[in-house]
């Protein structure tokens, strides 16, 4: 799949200081690039109330992505540390 990066995603990853989280994110991006569909990626869950928005668990972090079936492009929206405020608007 082709990967695109949102400004929010780039900003959130620049602030990362956890080396393990950075390593896991890089590995996940490589998996996404090599995948044909999201079904090939483990820990993918659709976000309730949103069409085409998914979250992918990597340790204590969640990668929020936008993906439309039939489209080979995935937009990385945000990379968040999982806590009680993660999914609040």
Q: Where on the chain are the PLM-derived regions?
A:
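Arg/Lys-rich, positively charged N-terminal/basic patches that mediate binding to nucleic acids
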Residues: 1-28
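Enriched for short, Lys/Arg-rich terminal
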Residues: 2, 8, 19, 41, ...
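A short, compositionally biased N-terminal segment around positions ~18-40 that is enriched
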Residues: 19-38, 67
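A short, surface-exposed loop/turn module that caps and links secondary-structure elements
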Residues: 30-55
């Amino acid at each position: 799949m082709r990967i695109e990066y949102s400004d929010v995603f780039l900003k959130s990853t620049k602030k990362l200081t956890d080396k393990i989280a950075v390593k896991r994110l890089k590995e996940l991006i490589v998996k996404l690039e090599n995948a044909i569909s999201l079904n090939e990626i483990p820990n993918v869950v659709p976000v309730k109330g949103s069409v085409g928005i998914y979250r992918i668990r990597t340790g204590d972090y969640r990668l929020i992505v936008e993906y439309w079936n039939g489209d080979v492009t995935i937009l990385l929206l945000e990379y968040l540390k999982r806590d009680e405020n993660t999914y609040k608007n």
